[in-house]
């Protein structure tokens, strides 16, 4: 009786071992097939960011890709256009700008150049761009100084209270 019970346990153990090995192999095959399907998909191509309202702030962009076995070929992504972007260059084109040049007395303008730093989402960008602005006195530092004085005055008032 013990001999039959031992053989039964041995057979059961062998069966479980075979099933475990077979289960592992089929799992690997499934994973490899999934990898093949993923590699069949093309790269995502993204449209420009379209603001929800106005010409800056939160918006969306649409992405597309090709491939026979791709489950998802179109998707929408949230994006943001900074409100201080240079509209004529596009939100996806980021430039490194030089310092402003001297004022041209004939045109009344000063200029500076920018070199392309980064093109986001496969955007087509100009390699170099030029900005111009009217010459004039810079009043912003004076405004900042007056704001500091106001803050100092408020702080003194708080200390007196």
Swiss-Prot record:
The record's subcellular location field reads: Secreted
Disulfide bridge map = 41-70, 49-79, 56-83, 93-125, 103-135
Outcome (variant: residue 68 to T):
In variants 2, 3 and 4
Is Protein biosynthesis tagged as a keyword? no
Tissues/organs with expression:
Expressed in high levels in brain and eye. Lower levels in bone. In the tailbud embryo stage, it is expressed exclusively in the central nervous system, especially in the hind region of the brain.
Q: Does the UniProt entry include the keyword Disulfide bond?
A: yes
Its BP terms in the Gene Ontology are: defense response to bacterium; positive regulation of cell division; positive regulation of cell population proliferation; response to bacterium
Q: Which GO terms describe its molecular function?
A: chondroitin sulfate binding; growth factor activity; heparin binding
Q: Where is this region: Chondroitin sulfate A binding?
A: 141-161
Start and end residues of each stretch annotated as Chondroitin sulfate binding:
86-93, 117-125
Highest rank taxon of the organism: Eukaryota
Q: Which residue ranges are recorded for the region named Disordered?
A: 136-161
Going by the UniProt record, its keywords in alphabetical order are:
Antibiotic, Antimicrobial, Developmental protein, Disulfide bond, Growth factor, Heparin-binding, Mitogen, Secreted, Signal
Would you tell me the Gene Ontology cellular component terms?
A: extracellular region; extracellular space
Leader sequence segment: 1-23
The record's listing under Pfam families reads: PTN_MK_C, PTN_MK_N
Q: What does this protein do?
A: Secreted growth factor that mediates its signal through cell-surface proteoglycan and non-proteoglycan receptors. Binds cell-surface proteoglycan receptor via their chondroitin sulfate (CS) groups. Thereby regulates many processes like cell proliferation, cell survival, cell growth, cell differentiation and cell migration. Has antibacterial activity against both Gram-positive and Gram-negative bacteria.
> Which family is this protein grouped under?
Belongs to the pleiotrophin family.
- Recorded protein name is Pleiotrophin-B
């Amino acid at each position: 009786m013990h001999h039959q019970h031992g053989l039964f346990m041995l057979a059961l153990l062998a069966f479980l071992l075979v099933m475990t090995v077979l289960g592992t192999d089929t799992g690997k095959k499934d994973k490899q097939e999934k990898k093949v399907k993923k590699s069949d998909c093309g790269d995502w191509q993204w449209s420009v960011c379209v603001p929800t309202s106005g010409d800056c702030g939160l918006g969306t962009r649409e992405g597309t890709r090709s491939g026979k076995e791709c489950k998802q070929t179109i998707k929408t992504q949230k994006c943001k256009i900074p409100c201080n972007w240079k509209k004529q260059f596009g939100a996806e084109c980021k430039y490194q700008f030089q310092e402003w040049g001297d004022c041209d007395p004939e045109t009344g303008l000063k200029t500076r150049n920018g070199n392309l730093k980064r093109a986001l989402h496969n955007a087509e960008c100009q390699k170099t761009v030029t900005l111009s602005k009217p010459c004039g006195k810079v009043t912003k530092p004076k405004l900042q100084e007056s704001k500091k004085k106001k803050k100092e005055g408020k702080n003194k008032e708080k200390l007196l209270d």
